[in-house]
């Protein structure tokens, strides 16, 4: 990780260096607890004490949240080493979507694979969608609303909300799917991957980089920018 002034701008090495945390948060001992907005874990959602068991379940989904889970896990473990007696609590982005009905949450793959590997539509940006739905209910002074909420940023998602509950969302097992993102492709025909592998010889690492970093607005603009304002 790179420290620019007191702003952390990269995440390679920072959590192995306690002195950097000390310089940013010089009075760690004054903290009663530390809260994290965490992203993804296999079979775990909601608000959780970040025990080693929960961290292992987060690590089990590193493959589907590679840009998020590894640095989060490293940060949590660094705080634990500095504050061994302080509760560490995580609020998962997937929490708002955890109650989606089966017809929205399940993928049409063999059900035994879904059950064995905890494959389902988890959804993300939950705090954002929940806030929007609550704001709309307060503004309109009613709770019996059917809404489509939109989270727009470097990545984006839509959520169908009925009476304050998420009933469907565009993101799924990973943050890769759904609407087009700045660099991520969003939903595509899965056979594009097989076709590209056969035609170009690209392997899994190259295909992963293509989908995660070279697609979306960046890819469709021919590499001009991942920012719609520039395009």
Where do the PLM segments sit?
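Non-transmembrane, aqueous-exposed alpha-helical and coiled segments at domain scale
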Residues: 72, 83-85, 90, 157, ...
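Glycine-rich phosphate-binding loop of actin/hexokinase-like ATP-binding domains
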Residues: 99-198
């Amino acid at each position: 990780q790179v420290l620019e002034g007191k702003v952390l701008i990269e995440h390679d090495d920072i959590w192995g260096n306690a002195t950097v945390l000390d310089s940013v948060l010089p009075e760690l001992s004054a903290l009663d607890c530390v809260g994290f907005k965490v992203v993804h874990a296999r079979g775990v959602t909601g608000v959780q004490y970040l025990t080693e068991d929960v961290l292992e379940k987060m690590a089990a989904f590193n493959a589907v949240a590679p840009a998020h889970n590894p640095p989060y896990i490293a940060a949590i473990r660094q705080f634990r080493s500095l504050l061994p007696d302080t509760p560490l609590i995580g609020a998962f982005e997937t929490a708002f979507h955890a109650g989606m009905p089966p017809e929205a949450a399940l993928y049409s793959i063999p059900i035994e694979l879904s059950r064995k590997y905890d494959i389902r539509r988890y959804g993300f940006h939950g705090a954002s969608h929940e806030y929007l739905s609550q704001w709309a209910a307060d503004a309109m002074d009613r709770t019996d609303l059917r809404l489509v909420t939109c989270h727009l940023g470097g990545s984006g998602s839509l959520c169908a909300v009925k009476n304050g509950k998420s009933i469907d969302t565009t993101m799924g097992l990973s943050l890769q799917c759904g609407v087009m993102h700045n660099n991520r492709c969003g939903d595509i025909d899965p056979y594009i991957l097989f076709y590209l592998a056969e035609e170009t010889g690209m392997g899994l690492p190259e295909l992963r980089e293509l989908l995660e970093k070279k697609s979306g607005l960046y890819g469709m603009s021919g590499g001009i920018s991942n920012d719609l304002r520039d395009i």
